[in-house]
């Protein structure tokens, strides 16, 4: 499933993050039933698990883990929570 964040997207500032959140919400409106974690409870559980496992996820994709406070990292975390098991 293609999501609201492409692999090379960078979320450089608050405005870009707000635009990403709008795309994420639109993706949920259009594709929510297809998300692995369509309820808030499951989404938050997956978000927690993905953030905890994110060093391995970034390593598996050949990327360096961004520094703390990186907007793109948070966007990746929210995107991953849609499908992370």
Segments from the language model and where they lie:
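Amphipathic alpha-helical packing elements
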Residues: 2-52
């Amino acid at each position: 499933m293609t999501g609201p964040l492409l692999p090379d997207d960078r979320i450089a500032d608050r405005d870009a993050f707000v635009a990403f959140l709008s795309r994420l919400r639109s993706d949920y409106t259009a594709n929510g039933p297809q998300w692995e974690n369509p309820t808030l409870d499951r989404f938050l559980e997956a978000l927690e698990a993905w953030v905890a496992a994110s060093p391995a996820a970034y390593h598996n994709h050949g990327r360096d883990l961004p520094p703390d406070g990186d907007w793109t990292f948070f966007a990746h975390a929210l995107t991953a929570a849609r499908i992370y098991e």
